[in-house]
Amino acid sequence: VSAVDGDGQTVEHTFYQSQFGTIADLGSQLEAFGGWPTFNGTVFAFNDANKENLRGLENWINFGQAQSLDDILEATKTIGVPWVNTIAADRNGEGFYGDISAVPNASQQLIDACVRGPIAPLILAVASIVTLDGTDPDCQLGNDEGAPPNLLGFDNVPKVRATEYGANANDSYWLPNPRNLL
């Protein structure tokens, strides 16, 4: 770590893990969230959908070897792309656009049932961060067949395949084609 005087210095830090992810002390952001447990007896743990994602390399190699749009779609089924959308077209005029990346499998039903307590709904409303009740076994992320644990599978991610046209507009990712809204 760079020091104020320009010299480097070694900084040690202990990271704590739980079955839900890395435990965080958010006291530097808001004093009430500091310490373990917090004022209301909770602990914050952050789950990273890509923490154990080593599938990306396989995904990109398969993209590079693809001979058709079907090959591209088959490659995406690994759910290896960490965070970006996929857009592709073939020589026959068929196009594809999808958000086939590592996305936590938190259905709206799970969010409605498991975002609880005085803080979690506020975090969701203000920061769009889903904070599930880790004390309830019914509040675990879901699993899709053929997908890595706790992630949405290929069949449940937004995507469209079309012959007319497709567009990628990051802030309007759900609108690649007005006839095929995501």
Name each region found by the language model:
Residues 1-182:
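Mature extracytoplasmic enzyme cores
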